[in-house]
Regions:
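N-terminal Sec-pathway targeting helices
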Residues: 1-15, 19-22
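Acidic/proline-rich low-complexity IDRs
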Residues: 4-5, 10, 43, 63-66, ...
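Extracytoplasmic c-type cytochrome modules immediately beyond a signal peptide or single-pass transmembrane anchor
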Residues: 19-101, 216-228
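Extracytoplasmic redox metalloprotein regions
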Residues: 72-229
Length: 229
């Protein structure tokens, strides 16, 4: 009887643990319907599937400009990089917010193929999809992320303290960020193979109609990749 009870308890613990791991690292939650309902919005904000889990964990992405403002070109956070940004939205064009276990931010084609314009100084900026590409903003962003990762303050204690100003993470989520997501993100951002500007990518940015394979698209997104544990 005791043995059966012990086996039952072990099974419950194993199942609960497996379910927690699935929820925290692998559960795929669709993006909001408004993104897929419009081709323009899907291009600007839709997640690109390159066959691997990727992205900067959302709360790290949010904390970095606040923790390292000195590495931005000027005050203003990500907006200072010259990225195309619609005023009513949370993040610039070219960024996709995706929940695969944890919420992460990934890049898509609009990082290089979107621009904004406004009618007059007081006009509301309008983001246009797929014009001639521009990679200057992305180069500035890559430099920013690398400088952050090289800074000794890019550590769990500093980042979680900044995140705590925005949201109170659960104990489990704090442990995941401290021991998994923050170390893996730092390692990924410091890996030179994750920051790739091939001649083909630069040529494509100047001529968006040129052939651009899925493999090269994967390289474009590799700078913000973190592998699933």
């Amino acid at each position: 009887m005791k043995r059966k009870l012990l086996i039952a308890v072990v099974l419950i613990v194993v199942i609960a643990g497996a379910y927690t791991v699935w929820c925290k690292f692998y559960r795929d939650v669709p993006q909001p319907q408004w993104i897929g309902a419009d081709q323009r919005d899907e291009f600007l904000y839709g997640a690109v599937d390159t066959g691997e889990a990727q992205g900067i964990p959302y709360w790290i992405w949010l904390a970095l400009p606040r923790l390292f403002p000195e590495y931005m070109p000027r005050p203003g956070g990500y907006a200072s990089l010259g990225l195309s940004w619609e005023q009513t939205l949370e993040m610039p064009a070219g960024f996709a917010k995706k929940n695969v276990g944890y919420v992460r931010v990934t890049g898509n084609c609009a990082l290089c193929h979107a621009s904004s314009s406004s009618a007059g100084a007081d006009g509301v900026p309008t983001v246009v999809a797929a014009p001639a590409g521009e990679i200057t903003s992305m180069q500035l962003m890559l430099t920013f992320y690398r400088q952050c990762a090289e800074d000794p303050r890019f550590n769990a204690s500093e980042i979680l303290a900044e995140v705590d100003n925005a949201i109170k993470l659960s104990v489990v989520d704090k442990l995941i960020y401290r021991y998994v997501l923050i170390p893996r993100t730092k390692k990924a951002l410091l890996n030179p193979e994750r920051v790739i500007f091939t001649p083909e990518l630069v040529a494509h940015a100047g001529n968006p109609q040129a052939e651009f394979s899925g493999q090269r698209l994967k390289k474009l997104a590799d700078w913000m990749k973190t592998q699933r544990p």
